[in-house]
Amino acid sequence: MYRLGKGSKYMFEKTKTKLEIIFIFNKNCRKFARKFFLSKMLTRLLFYLILYPLSVLPLSILYLISFPLYLILSYILSYRKTIIDNNLLRSFPNFDLKTVKKIRNQYYWHFSQLGIEMAKMISMSRKNVMRRYRCSNPELVNKFYEEGKSVVLMSSHYNNWEWMVLSLDMQFKHHGIGVGAHNTNKVFEKIINRARTRYGTEVVFHDNVREVMAYHETNHIPAAYMILSDQNPSIPKRCYVANFLNQKTGFLRGSEGFARKYDLPVLYYKVIKEKLGHYRIDVEVICESPSELPDGAIMQRYTELLEDTIKSNPPYWLWSHRRWKHDFSDAPMGNQ
């Protein structure tokens, strides 16, 4: 009977190990491919079979669906209940549990309506958008267009921010540019951005916003850069820390950085819900020339305005977001 020598045994085991690794790698690749394909297919089915047909219906009918959605979020799923309650208690330590529960339920109700409004955005007409979502003082922004200046519009995930993206190019004389973050589901990102950009707004992301701004500023094309600056910073060491809602909080400071680079006016806009499906945008100037202010002054003013907005009507902010994922209790105030 033939026996393998020591060297042959070693080579045999080594080859066997390599083959096993290749087999496992290929198996994992196939699993990932199947999962990715299923994810894409399910996203498309969700859009074409459910979301798009729903979006064609009048909002008066769609809002009827928001009530069962609210019941599911609140009583069946208890959607992110712990995160919402913790965020509210940290932000408003004087609230008792009864008040927290009341605001949580109001948030679920608002969040259900917001989901319906986002679905409607897919097929909403220009006329309907501008009838339901209007700026009370567009002249404050348009005066900078007349001066040939771009502007940075700072806001947050408060009330309906998606309709602002949709209508941005129609609200003001500037070319509207919404700055956002990538979605993990690329198919969903492509579909939702197609809806967002139907009426002229351009959507860019953190990885190409510098190129887009450079193009517009170099070619003197006045643009309104809409940036939601209340997100949790992905890099804690590169953020602005402020005392916000009773705690030290980190903020993305890209808005101020972009404004300073090109010395652009910075404005804050607040979205106010006047009634169901109708919103008003109030704009105010933070500064006309960032170069005249000390570093961090724009971000500080923004955090103060945002806090006032949230305190005026707490249920309309995005409380289900893990806003305080990073601990800044030992960090110094200001730019990190």
State each model region's role.
Residues M1-L38:
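N-terminal amphipathic/basic-hydrophobic helices that include classical n-h-c signal peptides
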Residues N26-S155, K190, R194, G200:
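Membrane-anchoring hydrophobic helices of lipid-metabolizing enzymes
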Residues Y79, C135, N159, K186-V187, ...:
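Residue-level recognition of alpha-helix initiation/capping sites
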Residues K102-N105, K143, D207-Q336:
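Non-catalytic C-terminal accessory region of glycerolipid acyltransferases
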Residues P138-N142, V165-D169, E189-N193, M213-A214, ...:
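Short amphipathic alpha-helical segments and helix-helix/interface helices
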Residues E147-D207, S234-F244:
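Catalytic core of membrane glycerolipid acyltransferases/transacylases, capturing the structured
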